[in-house]
Amino acid sequence: DSMCRTIMSAGSRRGAMMATMRCDHPDIEDFITAKSDAARLRMFNVSVLITDAFMEAVKSDGQHDLVFDGQTYKTVSARGLWDKIMQSTYDYAEPGVIFIDRINRANNLGYCETIAATNPCGEQPLPPYGACLLGSVNLARLVENSFDDAAQLDAGALADLVGTAVRMMDNVVDASNFPLEAQAQEARAKRRIGLGVTGLADALLMVGQRYGSDEAVKQTEDWQHQVARAAYLASVQLAKEKGAFPLFEAEPFLASGAMEKMDSDVRDAIRKDGIRNALLTSIAPTGTISLYAGNVSSGIEPVFAYAYTRKVLQKDGSRSEEEVVDYAVQMWRDKFGDTELPDYFVNAQTLAPADHVKMQAAAQNWIDSSISKTINCPEDISFQEFKDVYLQAYELGCKGCTTYRPNAVTGSVLSVSETSDEAPESDQGADVIYMSEPLDRPAALDGNTYKLRWPDSEHAIYLTVNDVVINGHRRPFEVFINSKNMEHYAWTVALTRMISAVFRRGGDVSFVVEELKAVFDPRGGAWIK
């Protein structure tokens, strides 16, 4: 975790890591709650590898053995363990769930590798030393006659674009400089790539379909089928030109779960000419890509908000506020002006979780790797309804399930302000944006005081941290520092008041610890956990 904090890209984005554990490991109960302390494992995503046998035991309310190296350490109620996973996810948004048997059964390379983990976002199940090579096709840009009865996706253009993308991504395998030789060998022996889509929700809107509807589910599966078919045929063509990937064996490859349902002419072509890339399709989050592509919807996610305001850094260092409009909404405005949006323009907040799951399952039918998708749940969803989301994901064939339920513990990654016809009177400036209201201070708080020694100071420092309990969860609320040493007193008071102000805003405040741990006194000493 500490190592990962040293990694930074784009000036601010930290690294990310994934930790997984099988549901039958003896330590699984501790693993499930590993991130209930917000200050721990900040750089990790954690997921439980769920087996088919475990899910069957959950359904039948059977027993489940926790085993390691052939020895059974404990036998637990399968349903009880499942409820522990669900409760932690309900409260803390982790761990995620990965249906590992399903992943290995569908893997084109099942004859030469076993998957035990995915990348942090979950769209790439990978073997040891496996690497992600991801790309996306923007479906929204391929819609013809948008918002018209004749609106449709240009199938020919899609096939051509997919073919070009596969060729480009295959070249990247050879052009990449991998940090480790084992990574280079793994990549070039199998040549796996992950071509996906972005702008799906916008494309559906532009052909007049509501995300999550039966029509949209069917359309999504059809488009993904077109992408998969074109990608596999393009890879066969590359195999004819450059040779199949080194570990290719036709019969075991074609016997995999993913290939069994592939079109017969594609299977025949693979059997005859081989295939250049072992796996070809994957759907990544595409958050940054979607912005570059005109603010299209991300991956296969629904539109989160149709318009919002961003502060954009200018060349002179100033910032200007600009309205950012969803691509489909902009296309609607260009065509119809200020005409009200049709009722099929739904967003992530108004969709039922079941609609999310149906869309993920529809796309998964033609994705040989996996999908990064978040199923947004309302804060007031009941625990039983929440558990049903995961059971639905399993029954519909998803390879994993990730949910997000905003609450006082986790906060909210993104939020959409509610609008009203009458704006409340306020003496605040119009440019002030309130992310959240401060928590009220109870009359009495529980806390702890710690006696600390600081280098070069003969007087002890007394650090007091008071906590508040919200929805049954304890979290820091305020911090004080007292000492007979008056050196830097004003700065110390100012710092603790600012830290306390952050605590009172709620949400995940563990970043405060990470920031202060990077501050060192040149005379010795540091802010440490």
Residue ranges and their predicted role:
Residues 1-10, 28, 47-57, 88, ...:
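Structured alpha-helical segments in the cores of large, soluble enzyme domains
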Residues 1-155, 178-185, 231-240:
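Active-site cavity-forming subdomains of large catalytic enzyme subunits
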Residues 7, 89-187, 192, 199-203, ...:
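Function-dense linear segments that define catalytic or interfacial modules
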Residues 12, 69-71, 161-184, 188, ...:
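Internal maturation/activation junctions in enzymes
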Residues 14-19, 207-213, 372-373, 397-410, ...:
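Glycine-rich phosphate/pyrophosphate-binding loops
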Residues 33-36, 48-59, 103-130, 193, ...:
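Terminal amphipathic helices with adjacent charged low-complexity linkers/tails
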Residues 123-125, 169-174, 256-260, 269-276, ...:
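Catalytic alpha/beta core of large soluble enzyme barrels
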Residues 261-272, 415-464:
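Short, Gly/Pro- and small/polar-rich lid/capping loops
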